[in-house]
Amino acid sequence: MKLRPLHDRVIVKRNEVELKSAGGIVLTGSAAGKSTRGVVLSVGKGRILDNGSIKKLDVKVGDIVIFNEGYGAKTETINNEEVLILTENDILAIVEK
């Protein structure tokens, strides 16, 4: 199955969390937390403005992003892989190399 996001939605695959602290301690359970970084897998066509025009998204497929997993974020499992469906507003930054 393949997802195609609508409008200003973005599909992101969350990066794996580092399971060791900076001091080398292995983190488990809630201490490990969930990553707020991921790679953009798919983007919608853009946000519909009040005048009916469409504003293209700033993020693109392949971007590594930092996101806020807030109220509007939806987690789905597609082909045994967990992905997040976010709006572009949930994305806080694009990580540039």
From Swiss-Prot:
Family: Belongs to the GroES chaperonin family.
UniProtKB keywords: Chaperone, Cytoplasm
One BP term from GO: chaperone cofactor-dependent protein refolding
Cellular component GO terms held in the UniProt record: cytoplasm
Name of the protein described by the UniProt record: Co-chaperonin GroES
Assembly information from the UniProt record: Heptamer of 7 subunits arranged in a ring. Interacts with the chaperonin GroEL.
GO MF term (any one): protein folding chaperone
Keyword Amino-acid biosynthesis in annotation: no
Compartments reported by the entry: Cytoplasm
TM segment ranges: none
Gene name as annotated: groES
Major location category of this protein: cytoplasm
Native source organism of the sequence: Buchnera aphidicola subsp. Cinara cedri (strain Cc)
InterPro entries in UniProt: Chaperonin_GroES (IPR020818), Chaperonin_GroES_sf (IPR037124), Chaprnonin_Cpn10_CS (IPR018369), GroES-like_sf (IPR011032)
Task of the protein: Together with the chaperonin GroEL, plays an essential role in assisting protein folding. The GroEL-GroES system forms a nano-cage that allows encapsulation of the non-native substrate proteins and provides a physical environment optimized to promote and accelerate protein folding. GroES binds to the apical surface of the GroEL ring, thereby capping the opening of the GroEL channel.
HAMAP family linked: CH10
